[in-house]
């Protein structure tokens, strides 16, 4: 059925192409043919209910947006060898001496993006009535779940900066907003790669709004309306625009 096919795509494959999908469909056909040959059944109908009988337990968990707006949690978008994925960034604050903890198997470039985001938020702290001594009196822990999976690249810069500002101010971020873009020390948003794959991941996760770099706006012409769908795409040049779109 159509539902079973969608479940195969979302729960049993994770790739940029269709090779793995072809293998999974082949496995279903072989097991169905064996049942018919052995005389157990005359016709096989594969549905969402009996799919596990053919492919076993799902290998992947479909990505879905959070159910409620939360403080210090923002959904980013990443481009991997198997296509686009959503990337949840979590920030927690603890009394301390201003140290920064980064976990989630992050690469050097991503760690540098986190430091850039922190520096930018510190530079605008007066605009948000943040105590100048706040960052000297608190430790910042930035975590990207699925810690066994390596993550790198600069495109989560605006996501981490948004999560940090949310945690520091206590203001929640919309659960239906995703974003991608590199950040500079001045808060400018720089272009990224893999926009098509990232937007597809956002659509599959149920996101309603996606912030992308203004310099990537021209790439939208090459992306089908089927992928963009009903999502609101907001091209941004500066973090001010990201914050306006993301905060509740």
Per-segment meaning from a language model:
Residues 1-13:
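Short conserved motifs of the RecA-like P-loop NTPase core
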Residues 9-10, 19-38:
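C-terminal helical "lid" of AAA+/P-loop NTPase domains
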Residues 36, 40-63:
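Amphipathic alpha-helical
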Residues 43, 61-65, 70-75, 83-248:
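Peripheral, non-AAA+ core regions of ATP-driven protein-machinery
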Residues 48-52, 76, 89:
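C-terminal accessory/connector segments of nucleic-acid motor ATPases
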């Amino acid at each position: 059925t159509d539902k079973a096919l969608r479940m195969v795509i979302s729960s049993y494959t994770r790739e940029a192409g269709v090779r793995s999908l072809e293998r999974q469909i082949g496995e279903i056909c072989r097991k169905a043919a064996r049942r018919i040959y052995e005389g157990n059944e005359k016709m096989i109908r594969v549905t969402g209910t009996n799919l596990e009988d053919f492919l076993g337990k799902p290998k992947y968990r479909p990505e879905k947006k959070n159910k409620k707006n939360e403080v210090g949690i923002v959904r980013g978008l990443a481009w991997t060898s198997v296509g686009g994925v959503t990337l949840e960034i979590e920030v927690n604050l603890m009394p301390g001496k201003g140290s920064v903890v980064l976990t989630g198997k992050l690469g050097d470039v991503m760690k540098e993006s986190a430091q850039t985001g922190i520096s930018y938020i510190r530079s605008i702290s007066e605009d948000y009535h943040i105590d100048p001594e706040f960052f000297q009196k608190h430790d910042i822990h930035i975590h990207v779940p699925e810690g066994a999976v390596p993550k790198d690249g600069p495109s989560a810069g605006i996501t981490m900066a948004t999560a940090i500002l949310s945690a520091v101010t206590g203001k929640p971020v919309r659960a239906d907003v995703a974003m991608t873009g590199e950040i500079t020390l001045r808060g400018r948003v720089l272009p990224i790669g893999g926009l098509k794959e990232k937007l597809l991941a956002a659509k599959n996760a149920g996101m309603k709004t996606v912030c992308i770099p203004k310099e990537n706006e021209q790439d939208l012409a090459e992306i089908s309306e089927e992928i963009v769908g009903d999502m609101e795409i907001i091209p941004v040049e500066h973090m001010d625009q990201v914050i306006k779109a993301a905060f509740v």
